[in-house]
Amino acid sequence: MLGKVERSEMYILFAMTQVLLVDKISGITSHTAVAKIRHLTGIKKIGHCGTLDPAACGLLIMGCGTATRLIRYMSNLDKRYIATITLGTQTTTDDSEGEIIYSAPKPSLDKITLESIGRAAEKLSGTIKQIPSAYSAIKVSGNRAYNLARQGIIPKLNAREVRVHWKFLGDFENNQVHVQITCSSGTYVRALARDMGKFLGVGGHLSYLKRLSIGPFHLHEIYREINKKEATMSERTPSGNTQGLTDNMAISESDKHDCTEPGINCTELGIKDTCTALREVHYTQGDTLSFTRLTALQALSRIYKPIEVSQKQADDLSCGRYISLGIDSKGPVCAVCKENLIAVIQPVSAGLWRPETVLSDNRKLNSNAAQDASGST
C-alpha cells in the first residue's frame, strides 16, 4: 500500500496533469482500470471515455478532477483498432467470451478465401447501418441490452449509422483474419465480426481487439514515454537496478513488448527495433498500469485551436460571462491564459463568445500565483 506521503505526492501529480492515456490490459473492465487509478492517487473524481470490453485491451482515456468535463469532447472521436476475426463459429456475445451457438461445416470454411473476405469487408465499408451486438450497454426501455440478453430476452436494437474503413494485415490462416479498423464513435467491432461471418455464410466472432488510437491520441505515446524513462534509468543505474530512484517511479523488466501481436509494427509505433520496449510502469508499492500524462491544455489543444485571452477575459469566463474576441471561427476553441486552459468557448455572434465548459477558476490561479511569489521573496 502507498503511504500517506506517497499518495499525497501522487494526488498532486495527477491533479495537475489531469488527463491520462492508459493501456488497459485484457481481463479487466474499464471501470476496474479507473478504480485502480482512484486507489493509486486518492482522487475520487475520475472518468473515462470509450469503454473497452473486458477481453479487449489498448488505449483508454481518463480525466482526473475537473478534466472529467473534457470527456465529452473526446468521446465522439474516430477510433482505430487492430482485431482478429475468427470465422466459422458464432457466439452469443459476438466475441470469444460468449457461448458458441453455431459452427460451420468444414467444406463451407474451405471455400473461404482472402478475396471473398475482401468482398465482405467492402459490404461493411464506408457509411453503413449497423445493428449493435445484443450484449451491449445500449438501453432498451430503461434496461441495458446485456442485462436483457442474460435473461434470455433478445433485445430489439435499432440500426445506427457508422463509418468503417478496413485494412488487412496478412493472410487468412487457421480460420482467422487480422485487420486494422478505423471507425466512427459508436461502432461495435464485435458486430462487424458477426456481420462478416454472416455475409460469408459461416458465422464469425471477434477473438482479439486492441485499440490503437482515439482521434489524435495514440497508444504508442505510452511506449515512447516508457522508453524515455528506460533511458533515464540506464543513465542513473548502469547495472539496471531501479532501487533508489527518487521520482517514485520504477520500470519493470517483467513484461516486454510482444511483437507477436497481430498488426503491431514496432517501427510505426515508435518502439525500438530491438523490441525491448517496456510496457509497464510501476509506481512505488502501488498497482501496475501503463500510461502517460497530459495536461488539460495539452490534451484539448489537439482537438481545438488554443486562443490566448487576457486575465480580465479569463476572469469573465470563469464566472460564466461572455467575452469579445477578434477571431473568426465556426466551432469551439480553447481559451488559454498563462498556459492554463480556462474554458472551451463557442461563438455566439460575430466577435462574441460564450463559455461552454469552464475548466479553471482564473481568480484562484492568480491567487495561488501571488502566494507563491510572496513565499519566494
From Swiss-Prot:
The answer to whether keyword NAD applies is no
Record: active site: D53 (nucleophile)
Question: Catalysed reaction per UniProt?
Answer: uridine(55) in tRNA = pseudouridine(55) in tRNA
One Pfam family this chain carries?
A: TruB_N
Instruction: Identify the keywords attached in UniProt to this record, alphabetized.
Output: Isomerase, tRNA processing
GO biological process terms, semicolon-separated? mRNA pseudouridine synthesis; tRNA pseudouridine synthesis
Q: Which InterPro entries match?
A: PsdUridine_synth_cat_dom_sf, PsdUridine_synth_N, tRNA_psdUridine_synth_TruB
Q: What is its EC number?
A: 5.4.99.25
Keyword Oxidoreductase assigned: no
Q: Which family does it belong to?
A: Belongs to the pseudouridine synthase TruB family. Type 1 subfamily.
UniProt function note: Responsible for synthesis of pseudouridine from uracil-55 in the psi GC loop of transfer RNAs.
Q: Which PANTHER family match?
A: PSEUDOURIDYLATE SYNTHASE TRUB1 (PTHR13767:SF2), TRNA-PSEUDOURIDINE SYNTHASE (PTHR13767)
Full protein name? tRNA pseudouridine synthase B
Lineage, please?
Answer: Bacteria, Bacillati, Actinomycetota, Actinomycetes, Micrococcales
